[in-house]
Amino acid sequence: MLTTGSIGAGIVITEGVTATVQHAETPSVVIRHRAVDGTTSTISRASPPLTSIMEQLGVTASIITECHLPIGAGFGLSAAALLASATALNRLFTLGLTPWDIARHSHEIEVEHRTGLGDVAAAQGGGRVIRHGPGIDARIERIFDLPESLFSVSFGPIHTPTVLGSPSQMEKVTSAFPSASPCDARDFFTKSKQFAEKSGLITDSVKKVFQICEKENVPAGMTMLGDGVFAYGKKAHEVLSPFGKVYEFSVSSTGPGIVKDNL
């Protein structure tokens, strides 16, 4: 599966997933969401991909993941959770895995569970990313040309496995792929919007936001795969705010790492 996956462009963002792992007699997973006021809520007590990463690494642990962004809304949180958990498990059990090993295991599991095709490859590092081939070993450009904040609104999830498992939908996605890589940041947003429209993935809610963003000259694209919009620049927050809760983040400078080590 190392050469299986998608090609394309995206942005690795600072808002990701934090994974806390501990030794345990039986494997367990808890998925939590942290609200703006600091309160946490449990979204799920099961995650087949995270259970699979423990099985693949040959370890038994409890994993608690936490994020601020909405799950299943196109922010790449499935890939982030896998990379974060694998990185933490590697440290806890002294597995001696390299960053490439961690990315390989995470990518294989994401493809197997159809939670994504290229997010792990992108999130190995930071930046505005252009993936020129499928898999984690393909050539990846990492460009740091978006110094200001990014903002996003989300109207709900799009079930990624359903889209990836639909031959007809994937045929539309393939035919909508741009003929050339974006030449700069502005072109990235233009191609992102065009791809959403031509692929048939765009929703009515996203169309409405796009119309306002275009009117206000705010660069914007659709979160993939999710019913939402991300936008860039000083006016972006103001333009998005009438449509719901606005999330703010920046372009990440790095990939996964250890935040706190209690060993």
List the predicted regions and their residue ranges.
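Solvent-exposed alpha-helices and their adjacent loops that cap or buttress functional pockets
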Residues: 1-3, 10-13, 113-115, 121-123, ...
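Short beta-strand scaffold segments in enzyme catalytic cores
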Residues: 11, 17-22, 119-123, 128-130, ...
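C-terminal nucleotide
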Residues: 137-263
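DPxDG-like acidic metal-binding loop motif
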Residues: 75-99
